[in-house]
Amino acid sequence: PEVEFIYTDEDKITTLDQPRFNPHFKPDFSLDFLRANNYICHFSVFKKELMDKLGGERSKYDGAQDFDIILRVAENTKNIIHIPKVLYHWRVHPNSTAQADTQAKPYAFEAGIPAIQDHLERVGLKGTVEHGASLGTYRIRYQFEGTPKVSIIIPNKDEKETLKTCVDSILEKSTYKNYEIVIVENNSTTEEIFEYYK
């Protein structure tokens, strides 16, 4: 299939004669992670025909236009490529959101909430979006019909006591009833762990 969206890793820079810093090595595309924070941010390239179809930037999301576009693109294509190389240098200055510890543009983080909320509505998910624990992150409180089954996946290799503590804690403390515990066995060798599995 033809690629419709490319994004790259990035770092930050103050001036051309200063060293670059704070590299951001991004993961490959993850819609769930994207909904939690705009980890893609810069540098993004979109296929023109797709952008024409989507209508480009929308002023409703001023400060988070890139986030809105990335979410809309993700709704319309699976042909997304991450190039794991630093190909973008984000210039840091006092009025830039490049300074992660600043409130230089709080409206940018506020605009992320309706961008995600509208995305959820477009894809048919019910939930409420709020700010996460860290600046620039978001939490979605999904609304479910009924009590869907939750799979708790625990990888393990020869860790009987740790695994037992984990499983016992789930069994004792969980107030949710419709769940399963899946233990992913990773080449354990001790008899003790296989006895515990029984």
Regions found by a protein language model. Give the residues of each.
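Conserved donor NDP-sugar-binding/catalytic core segment of glycosyltransferases
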Residues: 1-21, 49, 84, 91-94
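Donor nucleotide-sugar recognition loop
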Residues: 55-71, 107
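Catalytic donor-sugar/metal-binding loop of nucleotide-sugar-dependent glycosyltransferases
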Residues: 59-61, 71-91, 95-97, 113-134, ...
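Short hydrophobic beta-strand elements that form part
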Residues: 153-154, 183
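A structural helix-start
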Residues: 156-164, 190
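A conserved acidic beta->alpha catalytic loop
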Residues: 183-196
